[in-house]
Every structure is written in C-alpha cells, then in structure tokens.
Amino acid sequence: MEQPIPVTRQSFDEWIVPTYAPADFIVVRGEGATLWDQQGKSYIDFAGGIAVNALGHGHPAVKAALIEQADKVWHLGNGYTNEPVLRLAKQLIDATFAEKVFFCNSGAEANEAALKLARKYALDNFANKPGQQGEKNQIVAFRNAFHGRTLFTVSAGGQPKYSQDFAPLPGGISHGIFNDLASAEALITDQTCAVIVEPIQGEGGVLPADSEFLHGLRALCDRHNAVLIFDEVQTGVGRTGELYAYMHYGVTPDVLTSAKALGGGFPIAAMLTTTKYASALNVGSHGTTYGGNPLACAVAGTVLSLINTPAVLSGVKERHQWFLEGLADINARYKVFAEIRGRGLLIGCVLNSDYAGKSKDIIQAAAQHGIIALIAGPDVVRFAPSLIISQHDIKEGLARLAMGIEQVCRKAKS
C-alpha cells in the first residue's frame, strides 16, 4: 500500500476552495469527548462537530453498526429499498408525531424538501379553490434564522450575509421577527403555504423560542391552512434533553427536519411528516441519490436507539446544570457574559458590552489551551458537546476555557 500523502494546515489553503477558515491544527484522532492533533496535543470537544457527534467520537456500538453494515451492502440507489432505512423510518415514526419519513443527506436538503412539500401541498389542495384569493405559495421565515446553504434554504434563512451575493434569490419568502407573534401575524395570510421556524435559533445566537410564540404560530397556521415546519436540524435527537425540542413546548409541527446528530457523525438527514402532507410528494416529484443509504441508516438507527432512552435524555438535562454552574463560576471571576441561554447541551454564552464582538477571539484562545468550542455570531460563544460527555471532561474543559478567557481579558485590559 502506498504511503499517505503528507498534509499540513497549509495544504488546505493550497487545495481547498476557501469557503471555510479552519483552525491552524489538524485533528487526526478522537475518542469520547477528546480529540488529538497531528502533534499529539489533546483537546476537550465542546463543539461536537457543530451538534453532530452526539455520542462523542468512536462510540463502540456505532462503530460496530457501521462495520457490520459495511460487510453487507453500501449503496443501492432509490430504485430499491433496504432493511436499515425501513427500520430507521419505523424508529422515527414510533418516537414522534410522524407517519412518513423522507431521507436525505443534510439539513439543507431536509429543509429544501420540507419547503417544496409545502408548496406542492398548497398547489394540490388550494389552487383554484373557491374563496382562495391569489396563489398560495408564500413562505414566512424569521430573521437571524439558518436553514441551510442551498439557494432556497439560504433565502429562507433571514441572514443577508449568507445570501446577498447570490441574487436573484427565490421569491415568495418574507421574514418576521423571531419571538414576536404580532410580526408573524402581520405576515401570515391565506396566501401563506408554510411557516418555517427553529425552536432554538442556533446560528442566530442560541436563542430559544418562547412557548407563547410557537403556540401562536401553530394557531396562525391552522387558521390560514399553512404548513408549520420545525427546523430541528440542530435541536433534534436529544440535544435539548427531549428527543426533539417540540416536545418541550407541547406544539406539534406538520413537518419536522432532522439531521446533524441523527447520524452521530455519519451524514444523514430526514424530513418527518404525516400522511396528510406526505401525499403531496408522489413518485418523481422529489428525490435524492444517496438518501436512505444503508450505511447511513444502519448507523443512525443505532445512534437513535442509544440516545432515545430515559437515562441519556435525563442525563442531558443534568449536564446542562453542570455547565451552568461551571460557567457561572467563570463569569464570577472574569465578568464576560451578559447571559447564558439555551436548552440541554445547546448552550450560548452572550458576551457583555465590554467583550462584544470577541467570541472568535475567545474560542481561538481557548483552543490554545486545549478546548474546542463554537461561536454563534460575534457575540455568542456556543457549546454543543457529546450528550454523554463525562462530568470530569466538562470540568476539565471549562478549566481550559477559563484560561482562554483570562487570556482575552488580559489582552483587552492591556
């Protein structure tokens, strides 16, 4: 066997399209909540691959599922079905409101499918219907949301920095103010086919929806015959301490999108819905080559069965408290956070006015001390670690984070 091509961080700059600016080290191995780089330096992982590695790195049962399926069949295409995809569909149906599932490969694809379904359902059921004024194809989304990078989903996202360079954008999308029901009510009409919302805005700053807001959206969608879509790409599969965040609120969507943690690190996504809405997508109306891939579904089935247990879900809530206590101690020392918010193990630390705009500085300094974290905009440090991270790793990670914060504080005062 030929020796692997030697690579360094500089190789990224030479060979990769620069849509990202990764850290200056290369991770080569992971186990549990710990990562190691090419030089053997260890890092506690508070990022979880952006809320993906829900069971940490190298979980033995997940690895075994992948190897077992790899010895059977890898890929078939959508002209044939397979056992893992059917079993995973049944698991999701049994665990949620859903009656039908569409599998794809990423959160953006799942949201794209959800929005297409909503427009198709409206076309099939309301076009030329007596009393219907105008075409029913408008989509209501919310400012500072994030729904993916396809042209359709990035247009729904409500963050111009991600969409403004790709005009002309798809039309028929308007954006209300998140957590402002009056703003939504002014936009949702009988011409609205869908409302798409995150129960917690992840990229938008780890901002949870108010219960009254989501209940109000449900009522408005019912009144105007609009499809209510919950984007649970980041909040789903145990991240908040329930299998899906809608379960906290007692608000059931018509369509739910899931990705990230669903595969525990293996790319897979799903759109969940009921028979009523699924009927809008018939043979040939939508599709994907890799969706329902046997390898992905075998892994996801194992991930879902491991997470959807009382022990793991209650453990997420317990770990949330461990984080809050540790972060409060850090803030008592350094006074950098104005607010700590989120649910379960999706946590956002909002920087106060003295440190506004320094979220990237903090995570870069923290990395020097062996902790990997995320940002959610310039003013929010975000954590989305493994759902089964140990108390020891949380304490050690927060200690390393504190060293990074101290470094930023010293620099700010010098």
From Swiss-Prot:
It is an enzyme of class 2 (transferase). It holds the Pfam family Aminotran_3. Its cofactor is pyridoxal 5'-phosphate. One of its GO terms (biological process) is ornithine catabolic process. The modification N6-(pyridoxal phosphate)lysine is found at K260. Its EC number is 2.6.1.81. Gene3D superfamilies: Aspartate Aminotransferase, domain 1, Type I PLP-dependent aspartate aminotransferase-like (Major domain). One of its GO terms (molecular function) is pyridoxal phosphate binding. Pathway: Amino-acid degradation; L-arginine degradation via AST pathway; L-glutamate and succinate from L-arginine: step 3/5. InterPro entries: Ac/SucOrn_transaminase_bac, AcOrn/SuccOrn_fam, Aminotrans_3, Aminotrans_3_PPA_site, Class-III_PLP-dep_AT, PyrdxlP-dep_Trfase, PyrdxlP-dep_Trfase_major, PyrdxlP-dep_Trfase_small. It catalyses: N(2)-succinyl-L-ornithine + 2-oxoglutarate = N-succinyl-L-glutamate 5-semialdehyde + L-glutamate. It comes from the Bacteria. Keywords: Aminotransferase, Arginine metabolism, Pyridoxal phosphate, Transferase. NCBIfam families: arg_catab_astC (TIGR03246), argD (TIGR00707), PRK01278.1 (NF002325), PRK05093.1 (NF003468), PRK12381.1 (NF009047). Catalyzes the transamination of N(2)-succinylornithine and alpha-ketoglutarate into N(2)-succinylglutamate semialdehyde and glutamate. Can also act as an acetylornithine aminotransferase. Belongs to the class-III pyridoxal-phosphate-dependent aminotransferase family. AstC subfamily. This is Succinylornithine transaminase.
